A protein has these predicted regions:
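C-terminal lobe/lid and adjacent interdomain/linker elements of RecA-like ASCE P-loop ATPase modules
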Residues: 56-156
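Charged, polyampholytic interaction/assembly segments that form long, compositionally biased interfaces
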Residues: 17-24, 33-35, 148-153
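Walker B catalytic acidic pair
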Residues: 47-48
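Conserved D-loop-proximal element of ABC-family nucleotide-binding domains
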Residues: 12, 38-39, 51-55, 59
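Short pre-catalytic strand/loop immediately N-terminal to key active-site residues, enriched for Gly-Thr
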Residues: 11-17
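GG-anchored amphipathic helix commonly corresponding to the ABC/SMC/Rad50 NBD signature/C-loop
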Residues: 1-7, 22-44
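Internal helix-turn-beta structural module
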Residues: 1, 17, 27-29, 115-124
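Flexible loop/turn segments at secondary-structure boundaries
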Residues: 9-10, 35, 52-53, 83-84
Length: 156
């Protein structure tokens, strides 16, 4: 597949010239297009689609996945709070060592736990202060409002 991200540049092989963020956005665009076709599986998995993106672009990706999630099951592994906040449900995956073997634990997070986890995602393990958790709760509330706006706009 040939690709050009910059005006006036020649097309080059996608695998050679696209950054991690560009690859993430291209994958999201392709999955978004395929989601609109009949007969497409009802589940889509995005494994760290947030690689190479942040800030506003992370919010755009989160909103697009939310829109796909209106008609498909979306499973997303993410490290960005913007994407986690837009999810309808959030699970925390932890790996730990037990008797010389790696174990994985998956926990469905309650609303309060989501706020704590998003606060940690924003500021690191030591950043679970009351103000950080309040900020995360605001992020979750704003994400909920944004999803409503997106759903209303689509249904018009």
């Amino acid at each position: 597949m040939m690709f050009c991200a910059n005006l006036g540049q020649p097309l080059k092989p996608l695998a050679r010239v696209a950054s991690g963020g560009e690859l993430s956005r291209i994958m999201l665009a392709l999955k978004n297009l395929s989601a609109q076709k009949p007969g497409i599986p009802r589940s889509m998995v995005f494994d760290e689609i947030d690689t190479g993106i942040s800030g506003r672009m992370a919010q755009v990706v989160a909103e697009k996945m939310s829109q796909i999630g209106d008609h498909h099951q979306v499973i997303c592994v993410t490290h960005l709070p913007q994407i986690a906040a837009m999810a309808d449900a959030q699970y925390l995956v932890c790996k730990y060592d037990e008797n010389g073997a790696t174990r994985t634990e998956v926990t469905h997070l309650s609303d309060a736990q989501r706020a704590q986890e998003i606060a940690r995602m924003v500021g690191g393990a030591a950043c679970e202060s009351e103000s950080s958790v309040r900020h995360a709760a605001v992020m979750l509330a704003e994400a909920k409002e944004r999803k409503q706006v997106l759903r209303t706009a689509i249904n018009k």
